[in-house]
Amino acid sequence: LSAGERGLAIAGFSGGGKSTLMLHMLERDHTAFLSNDRVFIRRADNALQMRGIAKLPRINPGTLLNNPRLHVLATPQQLQDWEALASDELWHLEEKYDVPLARVYGEGRIRLAGPLTSLVILNWQRDSDAAPRLQRVDIGARRELLAAVMKSPGPFYQYADGRFLCDGTPFDEAAYLQALDGVPAYEVTGGIDFEAIAQQCCDELLAGTA
């Protein structure tokens, strides 16, 4: 996600709410979508830049139901059926819907690349009653958080000699730490409150006040 000359990457484990949080931040008109998949990062002119894989957000019915802007992506009958489900059933409903950003949020909300100035790692818990907390962390000292950050490039990166990474190739933690050196990392803990964390990310991380 980008906002002017600032940008943040959201990391987390599967089902952690990365896409939902990003869509909450896109409700702010000054933000722009960069990728719903991997981002490649490289240092240029003493700053870290990220380039995203061109992939639209994919959301589940719970995200769609709880965001009125997204209701255009479902039929009235679908919305009615989802509203009748218990929250736990809705959370585990295995259906995915692509979000056509231009249709839902308007033109000009997609960027191919931008600066990386913050990294947010979602480590919150759905069954927690605690308020969500966004706290700066040292990922060099919290190596377990790297598991949520490191992703295989899959077919999107090729070595100069034509080779691709093999399945099962171990990640180079030191390379990630070196690449992210100087980028403030933040861990989100506590219970899940998308709007509260979206507001804090926009007010602090994307505004440069943190």
Predicted segment positions?
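Glycine-rich, often acidic-flanked micro-motifs
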Residues: S2-F13, E27-A210
